[in-house]
Amino acid sequence: MGATGDTGGPRPGTESRRPGNVGNAGAAGQPVLTNPWNIMIKPRQVQRRGRRSQMTTSFTDPAISMDLLRAVLQPSINEEIQSVFNKYMKFFQKAALNVRDNVGEEVDAEQLIQEACRSCVEQAKLLFSDGEKVIPRLAHELPGIKRGRQAEEESHREAPFPKRGKVGLPGHVLSNDRAAAGMVWKPKSCEPIRREGPKWDPARLNESTTFVLGSRANKALGMGGTRGRIYIKHPHLFKYAADPQDKHWLAEQHHMRATGGKMAYLLIEEDIRDLAASDDYRGCLDLKLEELKSFVLPSWMVEKMRKYMETLRTENEHRAAEATPQT
């Protein structure tokens, strides 16, 4: 019995693990499989090889290969980009809250932040441009508006009550954006604001002069609810920044609501109506001159405005510059 067990045929388990295990040839010279389960091995191997061959031939396009690599790396890239935005997010948040404080609670600060981040991503594409394609600039990046914005900042610096500082990007970042977009930029000193002539004569201000709020003048000229556009577009206009005493009087007379720390500017009604009649606004359908709710000011406030206008006149600036001793 022991001899019979030793000389028996091969175990089925060992036979099935040996692919291509073939017994003795038959009478016709054809190989005979000793284990019928080996029939399943060869078709599976052929099918697997065919699938692998199709996969290798499907991605011979270089663009597809690079896109596959990008898809693999994209999650890591997104994490690093997000970390960069998180680093600068405090600046965007402060700026958005500042805009909401100046314009009103109807401003969606989160939407402003999202739009700013998307603009950053769009501008970052310039780093990988081929030098032939031109990415269109945003409307607020046009040269004329940039100059107006600089003039507005200059005017704010000269105001007796400085406006609350706004968060901005470093100067070298802006200069890089301008160079990348191919913009021609001139320094501020080349385009001084002329504060002279009859409109800058302090004698025109008296107790019968009518004034309007800057926010209402902005709407009257069809610039919508975006605060400050009139100052950017027309930096030559005389505007007076009301101090806390002035704002208290204006609120008591119901000319404006109590604004807390917000800036309130007063413009001369005659200047606004002259602008509305100029070629820039003649025939404009967005004009809403009924928004101009004019009023007169007390003598003590008019006197402050005269002194302020006198200090801003171009002639006095030149005299002050000439009187400065040269070292």
Swiss-Prot record:
Keywords: DNA-binding, Nucleus, Transcription, Transcription regulation
Residues that span the membrane, as ranges: none
Residue ranges, compositional bias (Basic and acidic residues): 146-161
Cystine pairs: none
A GO CC annotation given for this chain: nucleus
Keyword Coiled coil: no
Coiled coil (residue ranges): none
Subunit structure: Monomer and homodimer. A minor proportion may form homotrimers. Interacts with ZNF541. Interacts with the terminal deoxynucleotidyltransferase DNTT. Interacts with TRERF1. Identified in a histone deacetylase complex that contains DNTTIP1, HDAC1 and MIDEAS; this complex assembles into a tetramer that contains four copies of each protein chain. Component of a histone deacetylase complex containing DNTTIP1, ZNF541, HDAC1 and HDAC2. Identified in a complex with KCTD19, HDAC1, HDAC2 and ZNF541.
Protein name as it appears in the record: Deoxynucleotidyltransferase terminal-interacting protein 1
